């Protein structure tokens, strides 16, 4: 009854032509629905208190609370709270909270909390948190947290948290943590942490950490840590299974395979007294190289089938003429398969060291011989299974 009385009195007051034109002074807007309210919507009116179910007003300088939604044609300074959505045609300075969406046509300065989507058509300064996505048309500065997605059309700085992806159209400064993908169309300064991949189209200064890969389209100044790391130029550290730079490296690569455009990928076929028949791929740079491969019959040919995978990393130096001297350290994982039923351990590992002498016959073929020492050990206990001198020899195909 009180609300009905206020609506009736407000409506009669608005219809009184002898009074000041409604909406040109700050007022109270109690609203049941669009057009059913104590304050009519015009192009100059201000509202300092709004309560209702669904409200439409020109400008809000104060508090607005609605069951369904609130629509403000120009700007909001204060607090806008709605069960479903808040829409501001201009800029908001203050706090917005809605069950589904907050939409600002221009700037957001303050805090925006939405169950699904938070949108700022131009810039966002402060906190924007949404269950599904946050979207900023131009710049963002502060904290963006989207359940799935953060999108900043141009530059962004601060902390970004997203369940799926964080996308910045230009430069990003700060910390971006995403479940799958971190993407910056320009340069990054700070940290990019992603479950799948980080991509910076320009330079990257700081740390890139990803479960699968990191990509820098310009110069890396810092550290890349992932399964695969790639940069046009690198000044720092690349740590991963596969590391690649295109133009220059002023730093260090630590990985199973370290490559650049001058890396030669070579096929190696060889035999030895550890695993008897072996095939491997050698990734050879000017001085350093890595070898990844596998071999069969770690045990004797008279035993059942056994096999191993190996990785070696070393340094090669030209000796004289067509001869090259190299040395490497290696790790070998050994599977005995059905031999475990005959008393052998099901799997072993071996640590090995080798000195290699290589003779290049032509531009496409070379012969090599290796000697070294190694020992195989149990995974399950601190004991040696076998140890001794290593002897190998074979051919390298360029």
What are these regions, as identified by a protein language model?
Residues 1-18:
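Bacterial Sec-dependent N-terminal signal peptides
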Residues 16-82, 90-93, 108, 124:
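N-terminal targeting and processing segments
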Residues 45-47, 221, 233, 271-277, ...:
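Residues that define the transmembrane beta-barrel architecture of outer-membrane proteins
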Residues 51, 99, 113-115, 131, ...:
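Membrane-embedded beta-strand positions of outer-membrane beta-barrel proteins
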Residues 51-53, 227, 239-241, 256, ...:
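Residues on the lipid-exposed face of transmembrane beta-strands in outer-membrane beta-barrel proteins
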Residues 55, 69-71, 85-87, 101-103, ...:
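Transmembrane beta-strands of outer-membrane beta-barrel pores
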Residues 57-60, 73-74, 89, 105, ...:
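Solvent-exposed loop/turn segments connecting transmembrane beta-strands
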Residues 61, 91-92, 107-109, 124, ...:
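Repeated loop/turn-to-beta-strand initiation elements of outer-membrane beta-barrel proteins
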């Amino acid at each position: 009854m009180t609300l009905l009385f206020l609506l009736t009195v407000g409506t009669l007051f608005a219809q009184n032509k002898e009074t000041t034109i409604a909406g040109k002074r700050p007022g109270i807007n109690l609203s049941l629905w669009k057009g059913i309210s104590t304050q009519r919507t015009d192009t100059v009116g201000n509202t300092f208190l709004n309560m209702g179910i669904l409200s439409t007003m020109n400008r809000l300088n104060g508090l607005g609370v609605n069951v369904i939604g609130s629509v403000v044609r120009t700007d909001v300074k204060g607090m806008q709270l709605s069960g479903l959505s808040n829409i501001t045609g201009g800029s908001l300075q203050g706090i917005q909270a809605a069950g589904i969406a907050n939409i600002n046509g221009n700037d957001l300065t303050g805090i925006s909390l939405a169950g699904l989507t938070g949108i700022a058509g131009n810039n966002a300064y402060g906190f924007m948190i949404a269950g599904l996505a946050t979207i900023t048309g131009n710049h963002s500065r502060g904290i963006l947290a989207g359940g799935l997605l953060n999108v900043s059309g141009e530059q962004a700085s601060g902390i970004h948290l997203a369940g799926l992806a964080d996308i910045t159209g230009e430069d990003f400064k700060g910390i971006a943590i995403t479940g799958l993908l971190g993407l910056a169309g320009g340069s990054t300064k700070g940290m990019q942490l992603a479950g799948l991949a980080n991509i910076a189209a320009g330079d990257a200064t700081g740390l890139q950490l990803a479960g699968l890969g990191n990509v820098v389209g310009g110069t890396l100044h810092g550290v890349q840590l992932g399964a695969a790391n790639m940069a046009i130029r690198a000044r720092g550290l690349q740590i991963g299974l596969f590391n690649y730079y295109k133009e220059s490296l002023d730093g260090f690569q630590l990985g199973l395979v370290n490559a650049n455009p001058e890396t030669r990928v070579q096929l190696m076929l060889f035999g030895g007294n550890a695993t008897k028949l072996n095939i491997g791929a050698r990734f050879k740079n000017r001085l350093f190289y890595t070898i990844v491969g596998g071999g069969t019959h770690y045990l004797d040919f008279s035993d059942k089938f056994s096999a191993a995978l190996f990785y070696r990393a070393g340094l090669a130096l030209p000796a004289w003429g067509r001869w090259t001297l190299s040395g490497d350290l290696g790790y070998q994982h050994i599977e005995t398969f059905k031999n475990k039923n005959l008393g052998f351990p099901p799997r072993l590992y071996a640590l090995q060291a080798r000195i290699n002498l290589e003779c290049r016959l032509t531009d496409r073929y070379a012969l090599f011989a290796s000697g070294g020492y190694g020992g195989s050990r149990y995974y399950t206990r601190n004991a040696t299974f076998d140890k001794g001198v290593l002897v190998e020899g074979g051919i390298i195909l360029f």
